[in-house]
Regions:
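Surface-exposed, low-complexity/disordered segments
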Residues: 1-180
Length: 180
């Protein structure tokens, strides 16, 4: 696979494919290293310095210290649509570049239904107020039966406790499936 193809996959998985993700620009792409393991069909990325991302629609410069990144496939491919598992871990620092009413609206739009909003709902048990609904098959289920929250110092650890396939909906729109 070419570096251009690898960079496209990285951008899709790291920044996302929404209008907000597509508007972002990685300012130090040359510092990112890629690898594709042909035996396990696993794409990995690493960077020896924080990845610097400009997000003009949300008014941030983001420094992301990438600790782990991979995308797994069932066969030799590099297309996001064929990914069966992906993960990225790291720490992040946000620096505001500007703020106005449009940026505040954009930030609110992005936050509602986001992974951060989802995990906050798990931690503070505010599923119904946030309009998150968890389904097993076609039946809504109690999220407390599927997640265990453990507080460690100032951090929270969230564990999926069921091995059943469950679906997540927010505001009546199916967002994702996940498994333990």
């Amino acid at each position: 696979f070419t570096r251009k193809q690898k960079l496209q996959l990285f951008r899709e998985q790291f920044l996302g494919v929404t209008k907000y993700g597509k508007a972002c620009k990685i300012l130090n792409e040359d510092a990112i290293d890629f690898n594709y393991d042909l035996e396990t069909f696993t794409f990995t990325a690493s960077c020896s310095e924080p990845i610097k991302v400009e997000n003009p629609l949300l008014g941030y410069i983001i420094d992301f210290d990438l600790q782990d990144f991979y995308v797994k496939f069932n066969f030799k491919t590099i297309k996001s649509i064929n990914a069966i598992q992906s993960l990225f871990l790291g720490t992040v620092k946000y620096t505001e570049t500007k703020i106005d009413e449009k940026i505040i609206k954009n930030r609110n739009d992005v936050y509602f239904g986001s992974a951060v909003d989802f995990f906050k709902g798990i931690i503070d048990n505010s599923w119904s107020e946030k309009k998150f609904i968890l389904f097993e098959d076609k039946f809504s289920v109690n999220p407390n039966d599927y997640f265990k929250v453990l507080k460690k110092d100032d951090l929270y650890e969230v564990t999926v406790t069921s091995t059943n396939k469950v679906s997540l909906s927010i505001g009546g729109i199916k967002k994702t499936n996940f498994y333990a």
